[in-house]
Amino acid sequence: ITILDEKFDEIYLNKVHELSLSPESVKKHHDMKIVYSPMHGAGVRLVPESLKRFGFTNVQLVPEQAVIDGNFPTVESPNPEERKTMSMAIDLAKKVKADLVLATDPDSDRIGVAMPDENGEYVLLNGNQTLVLLMTYQLTRWAELGRLNGHQYVIKTIVTTEMVDAVADYFKVKCYECLTGFKYIAKIIRGHEGTDMQYIGCLLYTSDA
């Protein structure tokens, strides 16, 4: 067994930072209020550090949930897509009038997102809603930057919303569907190696923090 040291954290963070599509927007909105909860897990260091390196200067952690604890004492189930699980983060967000609430599950491979509506009530997005927003943003920026040339593709699983197909079709990006699991996604990516097709997605740097 080889234990990876902090230099691999640096490699990971640097690669993630290379994915930035709108540094000018971050600079303009650097002080937007973000509340983040790692749910007692692995995201406690890398997520705040990543946000800091992207340029966000006003990130507040939920203190009670910023302590690594495998018993997850402040939640019944550490699933950030459940409103009850996000309650402490949302309570803090209401207190500081946060613009965005983020939470990751203990191994930091799932994310919960909430934002205030016009009445100041925080709306929790589900995974499909978050995906469609991120996908639309990424493809919009790629189009603006001249990166879309008809040789890009995305991949969705059979449990993912069909809105992905609609967004891909709008941007004239091919959409593949596969069974649930990274191995099935990887198989499609592997099948395009050596071609001029380019995969668009987060899988390149997806990792448990």
Place the predicted regions along the sequence by residue:
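Gly/Ser/Thr-enriched, mixed-charge loops and adjacent short helices
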Residues: 1-85, 91-93
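Conserved small/polar residues in nucleotide/adenosyl-binding loops
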Residues: 205-209
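Short glycine-aspartate micro-motif
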Residues: 35, 99-103, 199-201
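Short acidic, glycine/serine/threonine-rich loops at helix termini
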Residues: 45-50, 71-75, 111-117, 164-170, ...
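Gly/Ser/Thr-rich loops at beta-strand to alpha-helix junctions
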Residues: 38-44, 108-110, 160-162
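Phosphate/diphosphate-binding loops
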Residues: 80-103, 153, 162, 177-187
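Proline/glycine-rich low-complexity loops and linkers
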Residues: 1-7, 117-204
